[in-house]
Amino acid sequence: MTQISERLLVQAHLDAKQPNPLTAEQEAEYRAAIAAELKAQNAVLVAHYYCDPVIQALAEETGGCVSDSLEMARFGKNHPAETVIVAGVRFMGETAKILTPEKRVLMPTLEATCSLDLGCPVEEFSAFCDQHPERTVVVYANTSAAVKARADWVVTSSCALEIVESLMDNGETIIWGPDQHLGRYIQKQTGADMLLWDGACIVHEEFKSRQLADMKALYPDAAILVHPESPEAVIELADAVGSTSQLIKAAQTLPNKTFIVATDRGIFYKMQQLCPDKEFVEAPTAGNGAACRSCAHCPWMAMNTLERVLDCLRNGTNEIFVDPALVPKAIKPLNRMLDFTQAARLKLSGNA
């Protein structure tokens, strides 16, 4: 992992913890209050698969959305609500605001960031790009608005492979940032000429191939599901590699009854909901007594609590603003991604 201090990681863990866990009665009260506020304010709650289960359930119950970052962006853009509450990390709120500048975008906390975002400062990344002006700049969605504004394309893990293949077919060479593991996976799958930025996700980088192989021995009939932000040695052990939505689909379609899952454990809520007859096991994140920093759950995603959702709704706090000078530049690569994926959907449905 690069360019991120241990202090930031420790502080994120501390901030994510609630000193007094909610009782069932308190939780029900918060959920009812949030639902009422959403309705009164013509607001909608969108949540990422990595948020805690109670937040995901609330989004579904109130007519919102639980999805990966691509569908979160699409849902917020197309929904008629005047206010969008984004339960996720900072770049997701920024993306929602860029795509729908006329809407009010709130987040439970503005402190929920991402190690990939932190590890890709715009000044350093821009200098890297300037050294290779002939290359097309492709950035992962897990980046700041400023980095997106420097890019030619924005991608998510659910569409990155197809977009890079398309660019390669056009004869383009690529600068990729910031996740080195996802970039290396795409490079290996496509053969594309890619220069990789040296960033990583603190959750996925902690999965260990040796311990994963040991776990497979304990569950010989299990299928291994791996997010491509994981190290290459972990990916090589996978039965299915993909984005959050793609891993959920794999859990539904593969015949196995047991799955070892190498991604944030927040995804278990949706997997268990859709596959109640199947067993899901967390892939190991540290071996032989070593301490894990994320322990298979993003500390920043864990900051999205019921208390903070209600507070931002009632008080209008943690509103997302994006520098107006960045918006025209950042929206171009985002719309390229949305247009590309929409065209791919239409093509797929036409071939069905």
UniProtKB/Swiss-Prot annotation:
Gene Ontology CC: cytosol
Enzyme superclass (EC): transferase
Subcellular locations according to the entry: Cytoplasm
Binding locations of iminosuccinate: H48, S69, Y140, A141, N142, S157, H227, P228, E229, T244
Cited Gene3D superfamilies: NadA-like
UniProt keywords, alphabetically: 4Fe-4S, Cytoplasm, Iron, Iron-sulfur, Metal-binding, Pyridine nucleotide biosynthesis, Transferase
Residues spanning the membrane: none
Note on how the cofactor is bound: Binds 1 [4Fe-4S] cluster per subunit.
Binding site for [4Fe-4S] cluster: C114, C201, C298
Catalytic activity: iminosuccinate + dihydroxyacetone phosphate = quinolinate + phosphate + 2 H2O + H(+)
GO molecular function: 4 iron, 4 sulfur cluster binding; metal ion binding; quinolinate synthetase A activity
Domain of life, per lineage: Bacteria
Signal peptide extent: none
Primary localization class, coarse: cytoplasm
Listed Pfam families: NadA (PF02445)
Entry cofactors: [4Fe-4S] cluster
Keyword flag Iron-sulfur: yes
InterPro entries, per the entry: NadA (IPR003473), NadA_sf (IPR036094), Quinolinate_synth_A_type1 (IPR023513)
Metabolic or biological pathway: Cofactor biosynthesis; NAD(+) biosynthesis; quinolinate from iminoaspartate: step 1/1
EC number: 2.5.1.72
Coiled-coil stretches: none
One of the protein's GO biological processes: 'de novo' NAD biosynthetic process from L-aspartate
Keyword Transferase: yes
Function (record text): Catalyzes the condensation of iminoaspartate with dihydroxyacetone phosphate to form quinolinate.
Family classification: Belongs to the quinolinate synthase family. Type 1 subfamily.
Protein name (database record): Quinolinate synthase
Species of provenance: Pseudomonas putida (strain ATCC 700007 / DSM 6899 / JCM 31910 / BCRC 17059 / LMG 24140 / F1)
Gene for this chain: nadA
